[in-house]
Curated annotation (Swiss-Prot):
InterPro entries for the chain: ATP_PRibTrfase_cat, ATP_PRibTrfase_CS, ATP_PRibTrfase_HisG, ATP_PRibTrfase_HisG_short
Lineage, uppermost ranks: Bacteria, Bacillati, Cyanobacteriota, Cyanophyceae, Synechococcales
Physiological role: Catalyzes the condensation of ATP and 5-phosphoribose 1-diphosphate to form N'-(5'-phosphoribosyl)-ATP (PR-ATP). Has a crucial role in the pathway because the rate of histidine biosynthesis seems to be controlled primarily by regulation of HisG enzymatic activity.
Official protein name in the record: ATP phosphoribosyltransferase
Pathway membership, UniProt: Amino-acid biosynthesis; L-histidine biosynthesis; L-histidine from 5-phospho-alpha-D-ribose 1-diphosphate: step 1/9
Broadest EC class assigned to this enzyme: transferase
Entry keywords, A to Z: Amino-acid biosynthesis, ATP-binding, Cytoplasm, Glycosyltransferase, Histidine biosynthesis, Nucleotide-binding, Transferase
Organism of origin: Parasynechococcus marenigrum (strain WH8102)
Length: 217
């Protein structure tokens, strides 16, 4: 049986739609009353593991899932050995450096050396500031990173930005983008190499559905 790791939350609905195009019905995962974390498809060909977005690449890397859907931001942050198979095109946003709108900073390089930067994505942030040759002190937060500059704990943040409304509502502004992120279909490398064709058939169906969705959108 093929196991697919699906991220609970914002990516789930579109993920289920992509797999539906491959003949895998994960619609039960969308039921708000569902409390099961492992859901087989009605046809019995596959099952879904409902996990946190950040845990998807871990389940795939360790082989507990042959396929998974996860944001590119998570892949960049965790750097686990999974195969990136398809850019699914949904869940788009950007990883950005943001500061208080009143700070006067116009770009990341304007930040003072050794200032504090708060983020859930400390690996991505470290990589970025190292590239600028700007030493900073990274403060890891698990949520509400906007409070860093608001409370004075940090000079800036590195976080995902979709519409920018949360930043604006909290008096912050994005000054530089690190990269753009979308949902990706990933696979367990060894499982892909040993595939009898069943995994590749799913991957190609998902790829075709994603291309069609991109053309329509």
């Amino acid at each position: 049986m093929i196991t697919v790791a699906l991220a609970k939350g914002a990516l789930l609905k579109d993920s289920a739609a992509r797999f539906a195009a491959a003949g895998l019905d994960f619609s039960a995962a969308l039921d708000k009353d569902n409390r099961q974390l492992m859901l087989p498809t009605p046809c019995g060909r596959a099952r879904a593991l409902l996990v946190r977005n950040g845990d998807v690449p871990t389940y795939v890397a360790y082989g507990q899932a042959q396929l998974g859907v996860v944001g590119y931001d998570v892949l960049r942050e965790h750097q686990l050995p999974v195969a990136q198979l398809v850019d699914l095109g949904f869940g788009g946003c950007r990883m950005a450096v943001a500061v208080k709108a009143s700070s006067g900073y116009e770009r990341a390089a304007d930040l003072p050396p050794h200032c504090r930067v708060a983020s859930k994505f400390t690996h991505c942030a470290r990589e970025y500031f190292d590239g600028l040759d700007l030493p900073v002190e990274l403060v890891h937060l698990n949520g509400s990173v906007e409070l860093g500059p608001i409370t004075g704990m940090s000079e800036a943040i590195v976080d995902l930005v979709a519409t920018g409304r949360t930043l604006r509502d909290n008096g912050l502004v994005a000054i530089e983008d690190l990269f753009h992120t979308t949902a990706r279909l990933v696979g367990h490398p060894l499982s892909m190499r040993l595939d009898d064709g069943s995994l590749n058939a799913i991957v190609e169906a998902v790829r075709t559905a994603s291309a069609a969705a991109g053309a329509a959108g």
